[in-house]
Amino acid sequence: MTKTLPKDFIFGGATAAYQAEGATKTDGKGRVAWDKFLEENFWYKGDPASDFYHNYVEDLELAEKFGGNVIRISIAWSRIFPNGDGEVKPNGVDFYHKLFAECDARHVEPFVTLHHFDTPEGLHEDGDFLTHEKMDDFVEYADYCFKEFPEVKYWITINEIRSVAVDQYIIGNFPPADTFGFDKMFQTHHNQMVGHARAVKLFKHDGSKGEIGIVHALQTNYPFNESNPADIGAAELEDLLDNKFLVDGTFVGKYPQETMEAVKDILAANHGGEFNIEDEFKAIDAAKDVQDFVGVDYYLSEWMRAYDGKSEITHNGTGDKGTSKVQVKGVGEEKLPDGIETTDWDWLIYPQGLYDKIMRVKNDYPNIHKVYITENGIGFKDTVPDNEETDKTVHDDARIDYVKQHLEVIADAIADGANVKGYFIWSLMDVFTWTNGYTKRYGLFYVDFDTQDRYPSKTADWFKNLAETHIIE
């Protein structure tokens, strides 16, 4: 059966500053934690990325031409404040004013994120989000942006608190590359939620025009054996780590007692430690009802089996299917069920998980006013056809199938009462990916990273028709 989306449903592509802009040393931009981390550990760098810093006019033209009426972008904190605080760099401010003006000229509304994984180097080395003082710096940066860029109508404070903390302190594939530091993970979770809440209250108190929210990466967790109480418990614990701790903190304004007891058990099973949340519930409680939306980034779901052995995580950053492993003592292990497909990077493809997550948000958090799917997409090892002189289209039918299936469950959720207002495909064009460099491609538009030429994909044509008709076919 053909499904449709509401006429006011918005469509666009998503990007992020460090992944798209390139130009990491241009016009006085300060260094971020990733610059040193990549230099010391990898063969790829944050340059050239998609060179959005110089190509944004072309990319926004493509966004408009292929049906996008919104775009997700982020401000590079270190383009505004090269050191994270103190001196403002006028060149960076001017760039974003020009970028937003071009968005307006192209009738593409920007949803602007303040922090998307790119903490300035000095702040990162001085404790990053483990310290309350760095959240002061974040709030001051947010305040500056709210006042400097009144042309922005939609603000996102922080992108994917969970991903930042897990990759920095559990998996170790983000700087500073710690592993199994659950105390640091929970501390970072909490501090970022406090910073987010303070920024929201500041935005509302100052009477800034527009809307503000946060983006959470949410995934649905299922027991591997639905009849096994131990597997059910593992799924519930993983859900606490992936979803409940963060969404409760954001929209309930506190962590329930049973959550804190589970946190203590997880810490005890993994080298102990503790984190400090005293006297800060006032901030997150004050913001819980005044946020305008939540962004949901959805890529995968997980099936969990009980496990109490040694914690071990192997991250698949190469695209060699079947090489990942996640086993966490006191929580559980991820186990692939029969019949569930995965990407080359072992991300489970399960659209029903998005429906289940949307409906849980609707049912469990009635103070969430509306939802945007702020990232959804699939990475492939895309190539341009060999006969590119006559055929410059990337043939990515599997991506169309993936996006179509996820949009269909979004339509189902809307029909069942969920207030989902828009969809951002990750990504507008190919971008640098944090732990895969330039081999994993998501874009509606293929980027030749040597020449910076853009080539459309079949998905781009399909997406254009979708945006024009709102019919999923």
Swiss-Prot record:
* Single GO MF descriptor: 6-phospho-beta-galactosidase activity
Could you confirm whether the keyword Hydrolase appears in this record? yes
What is the annotated signal peptide range for this record? none
Give the matching PROSITE patterns: GLYCOSYL_HYDROL_F1_1, GLYCOSYL_HYDROL_F1_2
Give the EC class as a word.
hydrolase
> GO cellular-component terms in the record?
cytosol
Q: Which Pfam families match?
A: Glyco_hydro_1
A biological process term (GO) from this entry: lactose catabolic process via tagatose-6-phosphate
Which pathway does it serve? Answer: Carbohydrate metabolism; lactose degradation; D-galactose 6-phosphate and beta-D-glucose from lactose 6-phosphate: step 1/1
InterPro entries the record matches: 6P-beta-galactosidase, Glyco_hydro_1, Glyco_hydro_1_AS, Glyco_hydro_1_N_CS, Glycoside_hydrolase_SF
Q: What is its EC number?
A: 3.2.1.85
Keywords of the record, alphabetical order, are: Glycosidase, Hydrolase
Q: Which family does it belong to?
A: Belongs to the glycosyl hydrolase 1 family.
Among NCBIfam families, the record links this protein to:
lacG (TIGR01233), PRK13511.1 (NF010036)
Instruction: Report the protein name in the record.
Output: 6-phospho-beta-galactosidase
Q: Which organism is it from?
A: Lactobacillus acidophilus
Q: What is the lineage of its organism?
A: Bacteria, Bacillati, Bacillota, Bacilli, Lactobacillales
Gene for this protein? lacG
